[in-house]
A protein has these predicted regions:
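An N-terminal, well-structured beta->alpha segment
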Residues: 2-100, 107, 187-224, 235
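Gly/Ser/Thr-enriched, mixed-charge loops and adjacent short helices
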Residues: 31-40, 148-280, 284-286
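Short Gly/Thr/Asp-enriched flexible loops that form oxyanion-binding sites at enzyme active sites
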Residues: 95-104, 147-154, 302-321, 357-360
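Glycine-rich phosphate-binding loop plus the immediately following alpha-helix
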Residues: 153-183, 321-344, 349-358, 427
Length: 557
């Protein structure tokens, strides 16, 4: 691509969006290069990028081009193509959703769109419930406010496969971004019936499916739990509070500053419940209210973070690994106790999620399926079980990045489900005088202490992209040890190990049951390092983990 010529073409043609047109006129040479040096990547996660002008940005033109390519793909593969669309609270999410709807409608693809912003799992659910050919969710999940994205689901409600993504990309690459995109007005589509709003009955059916995930099986628990909840200015407020209240949890305080949808995320620039800064305001509320439990969901409500009181009365944040282990153990224990464990039960987790999950699963007779990072791979495995007539064999799936799913009604992680099940689990143990931290200690005593941490490193722009590639190559080199722990084996998933698809992931198995995993983020210009340390106790584990991090960071120089 001739960057200068493409920039000038945009100056001449990108006039429909005033923001884009104005930004184009202000770009200097360096910014022009970054905005036009490539097209936004389209893969199994769809599109994700910074909102702005250019081929490497999220804007109405890149969204329309992707939608045209998807429409062409759907028309080739379905006699009567259709799509379900949703959007979150991010900047321009509603605009992008309506642009996508207009492109689909102009191409004869029937559109069902949520009338208001909704969590990402409701798009997976609506795709399945309405039997549409595909689903589209406009979201950038937990990324900072400057990002947005375009997530694509297949007819099964699971994110598209690698093969489907390649076919859609091939259609997109045939298109000229200005000359080849068909578009009809959104309001006109509503008037002529090519675009329809998804009815309330679908939302009610989704909430009922979440409620059906309960594993109390008639047991009575104390639901007078003081809950502080934050939707982090996203989509979770109505579905989470509705579900909790309908299940008997009425003592809910919502963090006022983070209650209403706001794509600027004014109180938490990085609205990710994995990060303690995003939980800080909720923690303040919890202290003021003397809450039993703090819950927070990310903007598209597919991740849940929690905090509970320790014995000293101070609030502790639990990691995604810890919450996932607790949920897995609780669900399995309840199913076994009530005779509700299915035949050949299955637990699914990602390869960067702590191995203790597999130990817990084995204890209860579950088979563990390990998949690549990304909940789409968990959804894909649920789909395989469904095709075998064994969807009920799926018991639980989780990933360390705060994503959980307890049923097969959707094919993506569900923060509404996660929030409810965490509250139920908390109530169950509280009724017996047991805290979640007590239960966690019990699991550590049974299976051994294990510390799992995640470290992220940002590399912006084209230079940053090249730097990440060079670091990955360095980690493929002959590194003998990290933090004094010898490398026993290097697993390079770029070669498709263990029957998994090829992926840019490196895992170094270290002595003493420790490991380090390095991979580029699929959604941001970041490298992620996952460290797992087994030790006698937390203090010893933290010391080893610190030394491993120091050694790993030397390769970033």
């Amino acid at each position: 691509m001739d960057i200068k010529k493409e920039y000038e073409r945009w100056l001449a043609n990108a006039t429909a969006d005033a923001d884009v047109a104005a930004e184009l006129k202000t770009l200097d040479d360096a910014k022009i290069e970054d905005a036009f040096y490539r097209d936004l990547d389209f893969g199994t996660g769809g599109l994700r990028g910074v909102i702005g002008a250019g081929t490497n940005r999220m804007n109405i033109y890149t969204v329309a081009k992707a939608s045209q390519g998807l429409a062409d793909y759907l028309k080739k593969n379905f006699a009567e193509p259709s799509v379900a669309i949703g959007y979150d609270s991010r900047i321009k999410s509603d605009v992008f959703a309506k642009v996508a709807a207009g492109v689909f409608a102009a191409n004869g693809v029937k559109v069902s769109i949520w009338p208001v912003l909704m969590p990402v799992p409701t798009v997976s659910f609506a795709t399945r419930y309405l039997h549409t050919s595909a689903g589209v969710m406009v979201t950038a999940s937990h990324n900072p406010s400057k990002y947005n994205g375009y997530k694509v689901y297949g007819a099964d409600g699971c994110q598209i496969t690698t093969e489907a993504a390649a076919e859609i990309l091939a259609e997109i690459e045939k298109l000229d971004i200005f000359a080849d995109v068909k578009y009809s007005d959104f309001e006109a589509g509503l008037a002529n019936g090519n675009v329809k709003y998804i009815p309330d009955e679908v939302y009610a059916a989704f909430v009922n499916e979440v409620k059906n995930q309960s594993v109390l099986f008639g047991e009575e628990v104390n639901k007078d739990v003081a809950i502080v909840y934050s939707p982090l200015n996203g989509t979770g407020l109505k579905p989470v509070t509705r579900t909790l209240k309908e299940m008997g949890y009425t003592n809910i305080t919502v963090v006022k500053e983070q209650e209403q949808p706001d794509g600027n995320f004014p109180t938490c620039p990085y609205p990710n419940p994995e990060i303690k800064e995003a939980m800080a305001l909720g923690m303040e509320y919890a202290k003021k209210c003397n809450a039993d439990l703090l819950l927070a969901t990310d903007p598209d409500c597919d991740r849940v973070g929690i905090a509970v009181k320790n014995k000293a009365g101070k609030y502790e944040l639990l990691t995604g690994n810890q919450t996932g282990m607790l949920l897995l153990d609780y669900i399995c224990c309840q199913r076994v106790k009530h005779g509700k464990m299915p035949t050949d039960p299955v637990m699914i987790k990602t390869i960067v999620t702590m191995d203790m999950g597999e130990q817990i699963a084995t204890h209860y007779g579950l088979r563990t399926i390990n998949v690549l990072t990304g909940f789409k791979f968990i959804g894909e495995q649920i789909g395989k079980l469904e095709k075998q007539g064994r969807a009920d064999s799926y018991v639980f799936g989780f990933e360390e990045s705060y994503g959980y799913l307890t049923g097969s009604y959707v094919r993506d992680k569900d923060g509404v489900d996660g929030a409810y099940m965490i509250c139920e689990m908390f109530s169950y143990y509280a009724t017996k005088g047991i805290s979640l931290l007590d239960k966690l200690d019990e699991l550590y005593k049974t299976y051994g202490y294990c510390l799992n941490t995640l470290h992220s490193y940002e590399f912006d722009g084209s230079a940053g992209f090249a730097k990440m590639q060079s670091i990955m190559q360095a980690f493929r080199g002959n590194i003998k040890a990290f933090g004094g722990k010898k490398v026993v084996k290097l697993l390079d998933y770029a070669y498709g190990l263990d029957g998994l698809p090829k992926s840019e992931v490196l895992k170094s198995l270290l002595e003493d049951d420790c490991s380090i995993v390095v991979r580029p983020s699929g959604t941001e210009p970041k490298l992620k390092i996952y460290i797992s340390v087994s030790a006698e106790n937390r203090e010893a584990a933290e010391k080893v983990e610190c030394e491993i991090v120091k050694d790993a960071e030397k390769w970033f120089a």
